[in-house]
UniProtKB/Swiss-Prot annotation:
InterPro entries: Histone-fold, Histone_H2A, Histone_H2A/H2B/H3, Histone_H2A_C. The gene is HTA1. It comes from Yarrowia lipolytica (strain CLIB 122 / E 150) (Yeast). SMART domains: H2A. This is Histone H2A. Its main location: nucleus.
Length: 135
């Protein structure tokens, strides 16, 4: 059956595989690339070790949030592909994303469907009374 001893030994523990900073932080966005871009962008003389991790996490969160809402908009329109119109609908219908991206123009996004209250037909009680009093 199985032996009770250690399966590796000294050789298995010394051959440790390296993990990227994205994998250590459990992120999909590349922490190393964000760090490089922060250094090359001359935003500051020095960049802390935690700054690119935090920035990559924030960017990943925003991307996931927008894509999730856009996917819901695409599914509501019975489409399987997200197009700029779905991005526009997702961003403009979400209060916080609309505030964050308020001055952003999305190409081919269109406008939100909106009809002013004064332009809608009035619901009057005359129609109901007139129909009930007819003989």
């Amino acid at each position: 059956m199985s032996s009770g001893g250690k399966s590796g030994g000294k050789a298995a523990s010394s051959s440790k595989t390296s993990k990227s900073r994205s994998a250590k932080a459990d992120l999909t966005f590349p922490v190393g690339r964000v760090h490089r871009l922060l250094r090359k962008g001359n935003y500051a003389q020095r960049i802390g070790a935690g700054a690119p991790i935090y920035l990559a996490a924030v960017l990943e969160y925003l991307a996931v949030e927008i894509l999730e809402l856009s996917g819901n908009a695409a599914r509501d329109n019975k489409k399987s592909r997200i197009v700029p119109r779905h991005l526009q609908l997702a961003i403009r219908n979400d209060e916080e994303l609309n505030k964050l991206l308020g001055h952003v123009t999305i190409a081919q996004g269109g406008v939100l469907p909106n009809i002013h209250q004064n332009l809608l037909p009035r619901k009057s009680a005359k129609g109901a009374k007139g129909a009930s009093q007819e003989l």
